[in-house]
Amino acid sequence: PAIIKETGLCVWKSGKKPYLILKRNGDMLKGKMALYYTGISHDTPSYVKNNRDYNLLARSSRLAYTGVQNNNLEQLCTGINMNYEVQLKEGMNTLPVIENVIATKYCGGGFGGYILSVFYNKIDRDKFINNYQHLSAIKIEPYLNEM
């Protein structure tokens, strides 16, 4: 199981031992995020050997990082959507089009599980939550736990 030691909007450098590069309070995402369940379970380790477009994945990561660094929601969401393009190229199912979503992608390893959607504002996000209760849609908020 995952143990969350860092809160806020974090950028991690991946590798054998990931490390934290940048941490923000995440206020630019307040009132704008939702999670919902696809209804499909998944087994992330079984996808490890799949072909990946590492160039596109790296570009999406750099763009999202720049968005966090600049506190720019549009840049961050462009990076998220580019990551979703990688997921589609890997064979994941196309996600439903949801009104007023800036960005969307599978969480974690994808191929089922949870979906993250970022909306323009709290009104659009909350409308989605109310309309998609059958998908167990929930709002999520960034928070920063200062220790």
Roles of regions detected by a PLM:
Residues A2-G109, L116-M147:
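C-terminal nucleotide
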